[in-house]
Amino acid sequence: MELGKSMENQTDVMVLLAKHVIPTVANGSNLVFSPMSINVLLCLIAAGSNCVTKEQILSFIMLPSSDYLNAVLAKTVSVALNDGMERSDLHLSTAYGVWIDKSLSFKPSFKDLLENSYNATCNQVDFATKPAEVINEVNAWAEVHTNGLIKEILSDDSIKTIRESMLILANAVYFKGAWSKKFDAKLTKSYDFHLLDGTMVKVPFMTNYKKQYLEYYDGFKVLRLPYVEDQRQFAMYIYLPNDRDGLPTLLEEISSKPRFLDNHIPRQRILTEAFKIPKFKFSFEFKASDVLKEMGLTLPFTHGSLTEMVESPSIPENLCVAENLFVSNVFHKACIEVDEEGTEAAAVSVASMTKDMLLMGDFVADHPFLFTVREEKSGVILFMGQVLDPSIH
């Protein structure tokens, strides 16, 4: 299997995840999550798992072997690297944080992976007696690495979970990109947005009179909005069904056809007779561990699945802890804002481990649609979601 095909598989897996989250956790609400963040966390968990658990994770994310796991990890992580100058109109960063109980230490191979492949910051903490401090530390870390967009990934309600934890792995993604062709704010006006229940809300719509990357397909159309570029290329894609209530049908089609997103990329700019996109801003959070288990990924959440992460040779009574580690919870939170200037978005994933084409067209996004933000060269999907009601912030 080529690396490119492996990356495409990651996209298909995350589309299936979206299909599962939308009718259950996100039922009737706007949705945004980061496939990149969740995928990297799963790869990291796989690297510290026993053979049987690792095989299930590899099968779940459609990778044939650990060699491909390492290659996909390197490719995904490299998307955030920028060899050029820092710029104010384009920024993507990822960060990795680890909190390990003071009674444990990392196995050398896993420590090497954390420090050299992920450049992770590692912290020793006291989960049992100071869980509130750990929660505050993780939340402060998340706030710093999302530029203040996500101030809380662990709530006070999670204190029992944290008290029983021995290890926390976290990933944060932050993206800010300016449109390559910005919208003129003076042209932004309020129009009706048609909800799935047939009602309408007034929301501000952006427009311009430039040619757009737009392509028509049977039952839907796809818009590609590029951001400014460095050596990487980022774009937002909006998948708009022709029917105002057609989003569920479109989602079913997207999730049932492999490579759908990769096979529906507008390549040509065309003139538009009508072009309107709503501004939107919202956040979404869910317990990803529940969704992953419902989708069949169960072994990481069973006793003794994470045998390659930690050790405690100097404290014999803790040996069973190192051998019986498992994932207790995976929390995920993301937010996004789209306006005339561009897009700002962020996401955090936290896993706690416990011992136990036309010449002229139109694109008026005045009813529910799907969207993605992706890096074009690698195909990595940074963010994915649905907009049901852009008036809800």
Swiss-Prot record:
A Pfam match: Serpin
Entry keyword tRNA processing: no
Tagged with keyword Cell division: no
Swiss-Prot/TrEMBL site (Reactive bond) positions: D356, M357
SMART domains: SERPIN
Gene3D superfamilies noted in UniProt: Alpha-1-antitrypsin, domain 1, Antithrombin, subunit I, domain 2
Top-level taxonomic group: Eukaryota
GO-annotated cellular components: extracellular space
Disulfide feature: none
Signal peptide region: none
Chain residue ranges for the region called RCL: 342-366
InterPro entries, sorted: Serpin_CS, Serpin_dom, Serpin_fam, Serpin_sf, Serpin_sf_1, Serpin_sf_2
GO molecular function per UniProt: serine-type endopeptidase inhibitor activity
Keywords assigned: Protease inhibitor, Serine protease inhibitor
Domain topic, free-text comment: The reactive center loop (RCL) extends out from the body of the protein and directs binding to the target protease. The protease cleaves the serpin at the reactive site within the RCL, establishing a covalent linkage between the carboxyl group of the serpin reactive site and the serine hydroxyl of the protease. The resulting inactive serpin-protease complex is highly stable.
Function: Probable serine protease inhibitor.
Assigned protein family: Belongs to the serpin family.
UniProt name for this protein: Serpin-Z4
Source organism per UniProt: Arabidopsis thaliana
Record lineage: Eukaryota, Viridiplantae, Streptophyta, Embryophyta, Tracheophyta
